Amino acid sequence: DKTTHFSLHPGSEALEITLMSRHGVLPEADFYCPIPWEPLEIATPAALEAAIAEGSDALLDRIFELIVKELEYAAPGWSEAIGLRQLTPDSIADAWFADRLTHDPFQWAQRNLQEVERNKREHHTVPWRYAILRLHEAIETVVPQFNDADSRRFRQGLARVFIDNYAAIPPESIRRLLALHRAGILRILTLGEDYELQREPDRTLIVHHRQRCEFDVFIDARGQKALKTRDLPFPSLRQQLLACGDDIPDVGDDYTLQA
């Protein structure tokens, strides 16, 4: 029995954990795929360079056309089922999450975990997941070439698909989340786009959908700005990095600083 169970220590019965996000979905489990990654067939480096060479106007739409062709080549059945030909860089994220948003997130996580474990046993790669994974890395090189309008469109649409697919977590982490939920400890709170976060000395308040939630401990995992070298809390390392004078210092194969 691979089922993970969670039991509270005596005196910890009051423990409650809440995961919060705008859409209320859990990350999916890491999926089986070949490593090293196979090359893309349509969205090749040459094809991407040719799209860039046409200029920044409508670049995102040209790149998306390559993405559509790559997915149709790799996963024709999935592409037809999701209506890929009718989607745009702006609407693909809504189509990507549509099915998940109609299901309980923990039930979805349980089914996804079972699928991932079965595919791992059978060495089966889900073609559309694998194609999106490889496209993510390829398209990353194009993003700096987008104009301001396309950059905004990319972040609000297509980037959400890449991030969700890339941010899959180990199956064991999914098992632990499910165990915490079964134990009545873990829940998910869907905040939506319009919420307020108020920090107070002894608590954090979240206001959403005309509801008010209070938390004794709040961990902000939205992703903070990178620290500057001078902000590092390790004096000796900070001094050595500052002395080298570079934003990214030279390091050896064993990651020691080079003089």
What is each of the regions a protein language model found here?
Residues D1-A259:
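Flavin (primarily FAD) cofactor-binding/catalytic cores of flavoenzymes
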